[in-house]
């Protein structure tokens, strides 16, 4: 009896293990930010998209295909020409993600590596078409407008293939060596012209100052001559007295200066009898 009991327990355990293995092989998980499409060996890709969570499928008949639907970055370098035939090196940074409802169509037409098949194709096409409408200088001064136009046209093209572009930006923009040298030479010429203009303006200011100074001297001379004509020697005597007063004031402020009156008895003020 005991042997039969344990034999049954073993058989039940084996059955449970087999059943657990079968059930486990029929389960699959869809993580957050992902979606799944089911490939059936008899009917092909099913139209319904499976959301996040744990789901059942028929082993050996069905196969889940997982897609990441979160935004992913990609850089697309492009070499193209501007409207004035200048070589332009541009790097386009794109944030993209698939449209969940379009995943069965995306897998059927493009496969899981849809981004590798589509973005390197449509990004250069759109970018070259837009850049060809601008001169090299406009690409610098109107960079935001160029980026907006590329974003609009590229978004429309990407939607045709079943995915969304969340952000598009021009992260790198350089020109050929010839254009770079031309820009540098233009900047040097502008600096030299600015310097020359400053020198000319300075000379004009100096010339104007000299003219004003000469006019002032001439006017002062005229007034002085008029004063001499009206006052005669009195004005000269007044100026002499003013100059003498100024000299006396300056000497009075100096130390060690003695004042000697005019005359013969200037030393110690001695009487004349002693001198005899």
Curated annotation (Swiss-Prot):
Keywords: Developmental protein. GO terms for cellular component: mitochondrial inner membrane; mitochondrial prohibitin complex; mitochondrion. GO terms for biological process: cellular response to hypoxia; mitochondrion organization. Belongs to the prohibitin family. Required for larval metabolism or for the progression of the larva into a pupa. This is Prohibitin 1. It comes from Drosophila melanogaster (Fruit fly). The gene is Phb1.
